A protein has these predicted regions:
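Non-catalytic terminal extensions that flank enzyme cores
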Residues: 1-135, 153-164, 168-170, 247-328, ...
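A broadly conserved sequence feature marking short terminus-proximal activation segments
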Residues: 200-268
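Acidic carboxylate-rich catalytic motifs and surrounding loops in phosphoryl-/glycosyl-chemistry enzymes
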Residues: 163-165, 171-175, 224-237, 374-380
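Active/ligand-binding-proximal structured segments within catalytic/core domains
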Residues: 136-147
Length: 463
């Protein structure tokens, strides 16, 4: 301990001497605060002191010049000036595709006027309600409401006769996520109870989500509705989709769940008070009409695809759920669906887990021909190392200590954001994302740092 104290004292003294030299006019070495070399000495001394203040749990100083850059390339180049226009054209082209399909069996030719979508538009996002929403989730929610408002306003501008166009936000909660304390292993097989199966678990953080969503809906003037996983699996197209998934499970299992080579479909045990589900679907048994699931305590239970109330109980892992949801959206001729999600789901993830299976589905069924999901990706919030900001339950203890020291606890939790900044904190995040939607090249940056948002929450505008 004395050695630690002496190291700390020496580092502090070095910094003090450097700072003192700033108070001496025309010091003999000629060093001034504008000298790069002197700046480097100051920064090095600051870091040296930080390293020994708490040597068992060090903090590191992140120095930067406060300048932000938006180099164009890829999406930021293609959508530099406008994102809403191309999105609306894509939705209108989907309607034209449907009309062409219908016209192929009739003598009526589709109208090829300036394309404007006429069907209602639903802007989607999802969240696991297993924590108070953190900064990344709040950014996705802001993006959803702001792009919905921009779509509505653009439609009002280009097609006044369609000013009653229905644009709505839909937030789906993944209430089938596991309650961590209810995950167990029996005979090498993992079982879980989900948030919808554990009494009171779902309500723990739901108030935070509802409060944030209510504010954003008011600010944007766009209504929102909330849904749960049973709503997805109650869609009338889902039994047919599940039948196709089961028929092609030999190929899909390795695509959607390569670790276990099994379709990650599950259903909670229906015995009162149990609710266990086999997490990875390794013990499932399939027929063309049903899925048999296994409970370690109560044995086999069956869901029939012909019974809608039973199908609504089905759960799926993220890739399988994404595929089923995308298929149901493509098959919906009455509405347009646009999804907003984090950019960690872009690229290879979608190519492997979504687009390859979709291509095979369209080829084998001739459904959804010429159509793909409409997905927009929100930039990630990343820490100093470039790792995305994550829920505290996925980060080791003390993983975000530096954020707490810097007063950035609010980035990890909406409840803490409210406690530290009140409504103004969310307002500043909203205003920042609003500037991205107004200048869409900013949406195509891979990420923004926690340090960047520290400035935003402090009321600083970066240049």
């Amino acid at each position: 301990m004395p050695a630690v104290h002496s190291h700390c004292e020496a580092a502090a003294q070095d910094l003090i001497e450097l700072v003192k030299s700033l108070t001496i006019p025309n010091n003999k070495d000629g060093a001034t605060s504008s000298d790069d070399g002197f700046e480097a000495q100051i920064l090095t001394a600051v870091q040296a002191l930080l390293s020994v203040v708490n040597p068992t749990d060090r903090l590191y100083a992140a120095f930067h010049d406060g300048k932000t850059h938006y180099p164009l390339g890829g999406g930021s180049y293609a959508f530099q000036k406008d994102l809403v226009g191309p999105l609306l054209r894509a939705l209108a082209q989907d309607e034209e595709t449907m009309k062409l399909r219908e016209a192929s069996s009739s003598s009526d030719a589709p109208s090829l006027e300036t394309p404007v979508p006429t069907c209602p538009i639903v802007i989607h996002a999802g969240a696991q309600p297993n924590n108070s929403p953190h900064l990344g989730t709040l950014i996705v929610f802001c993006y959803v409401f702001l792009i919905a408002r921009a779509v509505r306003d653009r439609l009002d501008a280009v097609a006044p006769s369609k000013s009653s166009q229905n644009v709505v936000v839909e937030i789906t909660f993944v209430d089938t996520a596991p309650v961590i304390t209810s995950v167990s292993e029996v005979g090498g097989i993992t079982y879980q109870r989900s948030y919808r199966e554990v009494a009171g678990a779902l309500s723990t953080y739901m108030g935070d989500y509802q409060d944030a969503l209510r504010r954003m809906s008011q600010w944007s003037g766009v209504p929102f509705q909330t849904r749960f996983q049973s709503d997805l699996f109650s869609h009338p197209a889902v039994p047919g989709i599940l039948a196709w998934v089961i028929e092609h499970r030999g190929r899909l299992a390795s695509q959607l769940s390569p670790k276990y080579n099994a379709l990650a479909l599950r259903a909670a045990c229906p015995v009162l008070g149990c609710g266990l589900a086999e997490k990875h679907g390794r013990l499932n048994e399939y027929t063309a009409e049903s899925i048999a699931f296994h409970c370690p305590h109560h044995g086999k239970h069956v869901i029939r695809l012909s019974e809608a109330s039973e199908v609504a109980r089905v759960e799926a892992n993220a890739p399988t759920r994404n595929l089923i949801r995308s298929m149901s959206h493509i098959l919906d001729d009455a509405k347009h669906h646009v999804r907003i999600t984090g950019s960690d789901y872009a690229g290879t993830y979608q190519e492997f887990f979504l687009y390859r299976p979709l291509a095979e589905w369209s080829r084998s069924t001739r459904l959804g021909s010429g159509r793909t999901p409409h997905i927009l990706y929100a930039p990630l919030v990343v820490d100093w190392s470039g790792a995305k900001l994550s829920k505290s339950l996925y980060v080791r203890d003390g993983g975000y200590r530096a954020m707490k020291v810097l007063g950035m606890d609010g980035a990890c939790s909406y409840a803490k954001l409210q406690a530290e900044h009140g409504e103004e904190g969310l307002r500043r995040i909203w205003a920042e994302v609003e500037s991205w939607v107004s200048n869409p090249h900013k949406l195509f940056r891979a990420s923004y740092s926690v340090e960047y948002f520290r400035g935003i929450l402090e009321g600083n505008a970066w240049h």
